[in-house]
Regions:
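Long helical/loop segments within the catalytic core of UDP-sugar-dependent glycosyltransferases
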Residues: 4-40, 53-135, 146-147, 168-208, ...
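Positions that flank functional sites
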Residues: 78, 139, 160-161
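Catalytic donor-sugar/metal-binding loop of nucleotide-sugar-dependent glycosyltransferases
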Residues: 133, 142-160
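Active-site donor/metal-binding and catalytic loop motifs
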Residues: 156-170
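Membrane-embedded multi-pass helical conduit in multi-pass membrane proteins
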Residues: 213-225
Length: 225
């Protein structure tokens, strides 16, 4: 980006938003407002990612299907060999993206992630952008797009890699955010998930059962009483 700006490429714009309202969702909505209205797709990549320069060219063809609103690549990681705990984290992530996402993709029910994701701009604007009140704005957006009839494509090819949490404390913060966000989504989308007005049975199944493990310990306590 710095090199392109230095060469006078006016298509490249950089914004630094410290302590922005709405956190990542708020920053993404800010960026969307400053994106060229003619842009057909919106790509989201986390700041710690190293991205293959051929990523966009490799996956953009899936948007030839006008029903596709999301094209998602795996959330892959690098530099995880430093400790046994980091290796275990990477193995867990790999299991989800190598196995779980394939099962969900068969039912058009993938979990959209906040990195290595490409979104059709028309679908994103139709959904009014990211929900700044949800702590997992990426997954919540994906579910809203499914509810609006859009489809998603999962491309199981690594086009970029980021960093795993640095230690156990960072891992706990990540899991707390995921668990809290899952409960927010279940509460806000309960009507669609239970009655399935616009969702298929497969989508309802995966989004309901996929988040039940977050409350598994509480259910074990209830069932043991």
């Amino acid at each position: 980006l710095e090199d392109r700006r230095a060469r006078g490429d006016t298509r490249v714009r950089f914004f630094h938003l410290p302590e922005w309202p709405g956190y990542k969702a708020g920053a993404l909505n800010f960026a969307l407002l400053h994106t060229d209205p003619a842009a057909a797709w919106i790509a989201v990549v986390d700041a710690d990612y190293r991205v293959d320069p051929g990523w966009l060219e490799s996956v953009a063809g899936h948007f030839a299907d006008p029903r596709v609103g999301i094209v998602q690549a795996p959330q892959a990681h690098r530099d995880w060999q430093g400790s046994l705990f980091q290796r275990m984290m990477n193995w867990e992530y790999e299991g989800f993206f190598r196995i779980g996402m394939h099962h969900r993709h068969e039912r058009d029910a993938i979990v959209q992630h906040g990195t290595m994701t490409l979104i059709r701009a028309a679908a994103l604007r139709e959904a009014n952008g990211w929900d700044e009140g949800c702590i997992v704005e990426d997954t919540e957006l994906g579910l809203r797009l499914f509810e609006r009839g859009w489809r998603a494509v999962y491309v199981d090819q690594v086009f970029g890699s980021g960093l795993v949490p640095g230690d156990f404390e960072a891992w706990c913060r990540q899991r707390q955010r995921w668990a809290q966000g899952a409960m927010q989504i279940l509460r806000r989308h309960a009507g669609q998930l239970l009655r399935g007005t616009n969702l298929t049975r497969g989508q309802r199944y995966h989004f309901l059962t996929g988040w039940l493990p977050w409350i598994g310990d509480a259910l074990h306590l209830v069932f043991s009483l």
